[in-house]
Amino acid sequence: MSDIDPTVRADPLPEDHDRALRPQMLSEFVGQAEARANLKVFIASARQRGEAMDHTLFHGPPGLGKTTLAQIMARELGVGFRMTSGPVLAKAGDLAAILTNLEKRDVLFIDEIHRLNPAVEEVLYPALEDFELDLVIGEGPAARTVRIELQPFTLVGATTRMGLLTTPLRDRFGIPTRLQFYTEDELFIIVDRNARKLGAPADEGGAREIARRARGTPRIAGRLLRRVVDFAVVEGDGRVTRALADMALNRLGVDHLGLDGADRRYLRLIAENYGGGPVGIETMSAALSESRDALEEVIEPFLLQQGLIQRTPRGRMLAQKGWTHLGLDAPRAQTDLFEG
């Protein structure tokens, strides 16, 4: 049961094209074993008690399934699902319009919740705690507060920047859940299943090659799979083999670690222009013509997880593994540092 109102939707999400590939129930969801096990308990408890499930916060890098899990929660709870995002809720009235239209126990999903307007956030507090909305009508001496009773609902927030959430908002989520990068085996299962759904079955080598280069992220795995299927249809026999996947991914500029051109430009900038670092994030942003947020949210998490770069108080540095991946020798001073 899913009611996505286009008037409260953000711009189309990158994964909207992969809707047919998304799992519909928790039992179909691969990965995030700890989060799934806990959510299963919380959903069952809410259903048995006939109450709205506690407010839930999903946080972690983009593309790990935050939106999908929120939709699954609503489906398994048997309630309606409404979706919006932090930047869209510019005024308190925008939030009030959504909250007053929620049915009993509905799930409201707010993506990028760390980007909520502070004025909107203040209105959200009593709604989360007491299911009441306090709105100020009028201005100056004639202003008065109107209290609106709301139906009990579940707010599901999603953020890639947990540290940017204010403490009062963060503390109002009873179920904070961190999503982790996926293992290669988990991504292999996802790729294998989705290849069949796309009508282009993959052999084990082909599916594993895509999984290996997907940066631990299902969204990226889905995107790479679609492109490899294009090559399989046009330049192959319709099947995704290891040789075809390797050829297609190399032509797409995705190397054996899953790094693309943007990642390699980032690493080469530190190596070739700044002697391996340290170099400040603002300098990196200007040199690469990328926003600081794009570097910190999209590029750096996987490079850090793979041990290719280091974050230091003085800036970013290339780790020994980063030099090795680029096929370059670290400067002598850095070599001594790594060995020491």
Curated annotation (Swiss-Prot):
Pfam families: AAA_lid_4, RuvB_C, RuvB_N
Top-level EC class: hydrolase
Region described as Small ATPAse domain (RuvB-S): 183-253
Principal location listed in the UniProt entry: cytoplasm
Residues annotated to bind ATP: 21-22, 63, 66-68, 129-131, 172, 182, 219
InterPro entries (UniProt xref): AAA+_ATPase, AAA_lid_4, DNA_helicase_Holl-junc_RuvB, P-loop_NTPase, RuvB-like_N, RuvB_C, WH-like_DNA-bd_sf, WH_DNA-bd_sf
Annotated compartments: Cytoplasm
Catalytic activity: ATP + H2O = ADP + phosphate + H(+)
Alphabetical UniProt keywords: ATP-binding, Cytoplasm, DNA damage, DNA recombination, DNA repair, DNA-binding, Hydrolase, Nucleotide-binding
Keyword Nucleotidyltransferase: no
GO biological process: DNA recombination; DNA repair
Residues reported to bind Mg(2+): 67
GO molecular-function terms, A-Z: ATP binding; ATP hydrolysis activity; four-way junction DNA binding; four-way junction helicase activity
UniProt keyword annotation of Metal-binding present: no
EC number(s) stated in the UniProt entry for this protein: 3.6.4.-
SMART domains per the UniProt record, alphabetical: AAA
Domain notes from UniProt: Has 3 domains, the large (RuvB-L) and small ATPase (RuvB-S) domains and the C-terminal head (RuvB-H) domain. The head domain binds DNA, while the ATPase domains jointly bind ATP, ADP or are empty depending on the state of the subunit in the translocation cycle. During a single DNA translocation step the structure of each domain remains the same, but their relative positions change.
Entry function: The RuvA-RuvB-RuvC complex processes Holliday junction (HJ) DNA during genetic recombination and DNA repair, while the RuvA-RuvB complex plays an important role in the rescue of blocked DNA replication forks via replication fork reversal (RFR). RuvA specifically binds to HJ cruciform DNA, conferring on it an open structure. The RuvB hexamer acts as an ATP-dependent pump, pulling dsDNA into and through the RuvAB complex. RuvB forms 2 homohexamers on either side of HJ DNA bound by 1 or 2 RuvA tetramers; 4 subunits per hexamer contact DNA at a time.
Similarity comment: family membership: Belongs to the RuvB family.
Subunit-structure text: Homohexamer. Forms an RuvA(8)-RuvB(12)-Holliday junction (HJ) complex. HJ DNA is sandwiched between 2 RuvA tetramers; dsDNA enters through RuvA and exits via RuvB. An RuvB hexamer assembles on each DNA strand where it exits the tetramer. Each RuvB hexamer is contacted by two RuvA subunits (via domain III) on 2 adjacent RuvB subunits; this complex drives branch migration. In the full resolvosome a probable DNA-RuvA(4)-RuvB(12)-RuvC(2) complex forms which resolves the HJ.
Protein name: Holliday junction branch migration complex subunit RuvB
Gene name of this polypeptide: ruvB
